[in-house]
Amino acid sequence: MHYFDHSATTPLHPKVKKLMGEVGDFHFGNPSSVHAFGQKAKIVIETARGQMAKAVGCNSNEIFFTSGGTEANNLVLWNLIHQNKKHVVTSVIEHPAVLKVLDNLEEFGVSYTAVGVDKNGGVNPNEVQNAITADTGLISIMLANNEMGTIQPIREISSIAKEQGIFLHSDAVQALGKIPINAKDLGVDYMSFSAHKFYGPKGVGALYIRKGLKLQPLIIGGSQERRVRAGTENTPGIAGCGLAAELAVNSIQDTHTHLESLAKAFKEEIKRISPDIIFNGHPKKNLPGLVNVSFPGYRSDLLMIYLDREGIAVSSGSACSSGDIKPSRILSEMEINDEINICSLRISFGTGNTLEDVDYLTTCFKSTLERIRSSA
């Protein structure tokens, strides 16, 4: 099997898997308990909190563990119902864990403006500024898009937010471990993360909350996570999240170089095989190792079926159901026409991929394109 869908999820790092097993075996106490078993588990959690904080450039007391990026986003957004200013500026390419939440919040008096993107999937800070109203209390723009990888100008947007006295949230789920992140330098007030995107476990993530800010809990009960997120902590998962973040950031330069070399090799060879292909996303301000490519005349659902038969996992932003295929929402917002849109695939390389994997991938692409052509 050949896995090229690391933007969807990543395999557990072996060291993370080992640590989680050890924590489950030897640190199983309830972290809220005062006895030694509980206190040992609490130390594990606080160690992970420190690792996570160091990875994203903040203080330990600014990191709050959640069940993942979706919960972290929800925690920030649902707090709007407690705020006086209930208008949000966001973008049309945000994850459903932002846009669908905002849709649901409308019945609670929250409104939002979703600014568009350019042909490369980039948000224009000037459009963000123009969308601000007297009632705007939050700006929520992702750090990097999950489908085509474009990195957004968060620092510039942060300057606008600060000038206007507006809080800034950024969904950074796709970015950690791929590009350097420093919450202080970026100037954000809230930032969401998910461990399974950086070789950590599923079902655990984190939210950065700038010191001095307070959020009302979504999940109410005990006093865990300093009363921001009730419920007995997932100690093995949190330990895995912390170590995965540490490992990802410590090797970020090597990872960046490796992923870029794989993407470069793939682009060069696939362009030679099929000269009329189109690469989507920003040519430079892009996550390393993520390639969104359109194959005009070849539907993405057919491409994925043929590639899957060869043991290759890639993905598509297009929704396939009962033989019908709907264009990718993200690519449509970039004004890519439907004919090209439904022929687009996302290839996202990971640290375990090799140049030999790229050779196999491009060889299978070549045979797949030939097979589809001959059967047309």
Model features per residue range: what roles?
Residues 1-376:
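Pyridoxal 5′-phosphate
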